[in-house]
Amino acid sequence: MGRVLDLGAGNGIMGQVMKDYGVARMIGADIIPEAKKACIRDSPGVYDEYYVADFTNLKPELIEEISEWSVDCLTTVAALGFGDIPTKAFLQALKFVQTGGWVAFNIKETFLNNSDTSGFSRLIRELIFSEYLDLYHLERYRHRLSMEGIPLYYYAIVAEKKSDIPEDFLKTFKIDE
């Protein structure tokens, strides 16, 4: 793994873990300016660059700048499926990953259930059962306990990007952006 884009980077916890595992080049991205401030405070120097940007509406110059990083891995932890990162933003970040690169993220277990018809749930199911991603690892784990003490389960997902995702992917599958 050479260059990682950490979407929803927050205060840099994931970046710090990746750095501890020897990842040398990392980019953080979050829509919230306070997240970057928290990262500078809590995890200084972890990211080579940290973008505060709306990935649903990136300016062409920023698309070009991020593309020049030749990202070969996308990570997103505890930020998908609750409206924190919209489907369009996640798909945009995934487009930055080079073919043959990796994507690693976690999602609440119900997002893989066919009864969940939310846009994000449908996006993930369409992607992991498509020619665009090759599922490498899927693991259910207890993410945390609810305030009532009930276990909340998530899936950790790792997949290889096999080909570019078409611009009209969301429209083709009638997925809300």
Which residue ranges define each predicted feature?
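Conserved beta-strand signature within the Rossmann-like core of class I S-adenosyl-L-methionine
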Residues: G100-K108
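A short glycine-rich, Lys/Arg-flanked "PGG" loop and its adjoining helix->strand segment in the class I
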Residues: K88-T99
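A short acidic, Gly/Pro-enriched loop at the edge of an enzyme's catalytic core
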Residues: E61-L74
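Class I SAM-dependent methyltransferase SAM/SAH-binding core
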Residues: L5, N11-L62
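A short SAM/SAH-binding and catalytic strip from SAM-dependent methyltransferases
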Residues: V71-P86
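Short alpha-helix
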Residues: S115-E131
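Short "lid" loop at the C-terminus of a central beta-strand within the Rossmann-like core
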Residues: T56, K108-N113
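Class I S-adenosyl-L-methionine
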Residues: F129-E177
